[in-house]
Amino acid sequence: MTASPVRVYYSKVCKCYIAALSRAAENTGDFIMSFFEKLFGSFSDKELKRINPLKDKVLALEPEMQKLTDEQLQAKTTEFKARLEKGETLDDLLPEAFAVCREADWRVLGMKPYPVQIIGGIVLHRACIAEMQTGEGKTLVATMPVYLNALTGKGVHVVTVNDYLARRDSEWMGKVYRFLGLTVGLVVHGVEANDRKAAYAADVTYGTNNEFGFDYLRDNMVVYKANMVQRGHAYAIVDEVDSILIDEARTPLIISGKGEDSSVMYKRADDFAKTLKKSVIVELDDKVAAEEQVDGDYVVDEKRKTATLTESGVQKAEAFFHVENLADADNMSLRHYIDGAIKARGVMHRDIDYIVKEGEVIIVDEFTGRLMYGRRFNDGLHQAIEAKEGVTVAAESKTLATVTFQNYFRMYDKLAGMTGTASTEADEFSEIYGLNIVSIPTNKPRARKDLPDSVYKTVNGKYNAVIEQVAECHAKGQPVLVGTVSVEKSEALSKLLKKKGIEHNVLNAKQHEREAEIVAQAGKQGAVTIATNMAGRGTDIMLGGNVSYMAKAALRKELSRDLTKDLAQLKDEYEHAKARAKAAGTELPTPPEETIDAQLEHLMTECDGHAETEDAAVLHARQRFEELCEEFEPEIKREAAAVREAGGLFIIGTERHESRRIDNQLRGRAGRQGDPGASRFFLSLEDDLMRIFGGERVQNLMDSLGLEEDVPIENKLITNTIESAQKKLEASNFAIRKQVLQYDDVMNQQREIIYKQRQMVLDGEDISDKLHEMMRQSIDDACTNYLNGETADDWDFAGLRRHFMNWLCLPSDFNYTKDQLEDLTKEGIADELYKRGMDILTAKEKKYGSKTMRELERICLLRNVDSKWMDHIDNMDQLKQGMGLRGYGQHDPVVEYRIEGFAMFDEMIASIREDAVHMLLTIEIRQQNAEPKREQIAKPTGEGAPTQAGTKGAAPVRVTKIGRNDPCPCGSGLKWKKCTCKEYHPDL
């Protein structure tokens, strides 16, 4: 019997009602939080109320500051420093210091911070995150807290996400600090060690997060204190703080050296992975049950992004590699290669997670869409992808030093940050970094309209709607920015727009060279720009276009014409000079084309720069640039008015990101400084986020309503479902980052102990007593180990003799009569060995002198600390790799890692103790008149390698006796302590 229309309608309403109740239950926690914030006010609201009176004090001082001459204003810096020395605090100085800096901003830059920017500056001084919308002038905001905190003389670090911004801001804002009598330094890629040291010694240091972190690691690898560049971590302001402290939190900084070449095994593992059948599931809830259900050799869990062999896959692996049991400990390395191969083929996708360019696999940043040159996936995944793509498989690397951004930035006494999107990650900022977020009001009311999501059943339906929306906006002259999540999808949309005959620019990881130009001109009338997330931040999109880029384009043509007008004459001169150089056998001159190109690029870089210069060509280029800006200004204003009339910039999102924050960044490109604009997300049930996280509920709703693929649904229920999925994923990613931190906290505690011990050596402290204690402890440990029987008859004298052979023992030692055994004690034997050691050291001091002995002591301890620590890093990494399976045994992997990790650390400390003492007792100097020099144990390879420490041609040191961990000279391949040959072990 056919149901009546009323019954059908009632059924649909019930389904919607039930779904709404379900969603309401999920959002109860958010509702309660929102209720209490409305009732009592959020932290941000309360903080703004506390800050407003301070802001008013700063503004009230403006007339007083305006009356001061430049010299009087500059003298305030000296006055403030003197007041700090007399006991005043930075908080006491804040109103005056901010007012002084604000006036300096105006006199030097022609910009005066607005009241809301003063609020932002106070928030930064209070070690919070200032959440400021796009176009609100974060760069200028930072000048006030930077100036105030630099007065302490401890140094302020301003951290940016790339070299360009660090250089630009150090030159631009640096003018203000220099005007006020402060020094400014810059730390970017390529800066030499001596210049880095000077940069860190400055009052204000600009640099990237990577450079600050790597310099910290390099400082803890140097062998002389003079080679260290950083001087402490007092105060840092992190620009785009969410990008650095959240998005980059799972990526450790690693300085590595050359490791083993395992390319053959990676290729074999990939050959095996090609033969396997893949099975994809949304979520692997029950591993065992899932493996029984799936029809494949390995399972790809889309939600967790993992790949796991099934029982069928294990059997095939054992047959392919001719092993009996893949789970055996002996096959752990093989399992590592196989796991990497199936993850490379099942989880990692070309043109989404990475691209292949000129025979190299380059990572695509999932948050920005930019190429991450120099970065590599860890745990051998990068090599597995290289094998999959058929490019050269690079050798594995050995980790020499490592730290996460989480633990690096938690070292600062005071930390603050700026971003346009932080609120969605408030819990993480608070829990991990102790940072609260204050939302700064905009200077002008926001006029952007955020339209409801349009959800379609299929991707085709969604793309058709996107093209229609773009065509509609384009027809009326409204600029459009279309955001995509991958290279692949941006190119698919580009093809559809070409078919429609709509001119557009594409900006993705493959076509990033014109990024700044494309994004800056994305606000021109009728412009259409398709971009991955790389357009989400960092460059302002100005309505009507960017006058600076128009002026630069015109200036490039003029300069190119001027520089090449005498090219023919220059070529003739070059040919004559080249002939003379060949005849004389001297170096050939540079071709004029190369010289002209280099000069052109230099002038184009400097034409809008801020660095002080006396170069006439640069000064002329800057003057002409300003003139061209004035010429283009009226045209830009007319076009901007037309764009505003058309509705401003229209933002189209074609897919929701895993994080709401990234979506908000895309929306934030429109509506800067009160400009009109709009945003809308076009989604489909086939999108990854919808398909994996809760799309079934929406699918059922759309099916029940009988909607076709090109008919959208715009409903709050849909939006709530999507946001709920994003919140779940954000919580999941937070949990992962938190676990990364928990693991790294174990390493961090150990790292602090090791680095503190290194620093003690570098500082030149007298470590003689420390080494004497280490010798006593090593002797006591050995005696406890070998002399552990109840009576002397049960003691292992042969073992003790082997242990100390050739440094504290001779083959004739510990041969006792029965009567002598009765009088022996462990303490007596230990005392005798310790006395021998002290006698050896006393003789060495007499032979070499106290100065040389102190240096030898430092060499021995430093070499052993460094070499053992590097091995320990690898061992801890291997331990962590095996921790995942502990969860199946009802054990907390982090707790197990901490317990076993510190047991390994204790073993390493004992090894450092014994080997350092052994080296000190046996070391000899070849050249009596030469002072011993320290040498770096391991040297990094590739980019970011630290400058080699020490002195070239230093007098070498040598160990005259065989070390316990040295290879036995008999050629067995065993360490001396484990070899049983008679020739080199006469006591056996």
Where are these regions (language model features)?
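Short hydrophobic transmembrane-like helices used for membrane targeting/insertion
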Residues: M1, V6-V8, V13, I18, ...
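Acidic, low-complexity intrinsically disordered tails
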Residues: K12-V13, L21-D30, Q569, E573-A617, ...
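Conserved P-loop NTPase motor core
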Residues: L21, G29-S684, D688-L701, K756, ...
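Glycine-centered loop/turn positions within well-structured domains
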Residues: T251, V480, R537, W869, ...
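Extended, charged helical/alpha-beta scaffold domains that provide interaction surfaces
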Residues: Y354-I362, T368-R376, H610, V643-R644, ...
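Short, Lys/Glu-rich amphipathic helical modules
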Residues: G477-S490, D763-G764, T791, K818, ...
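Hydrophobic, well-ordered secondary-structure elements that form the walls
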Residues: V482, I530, W869, F905, ...
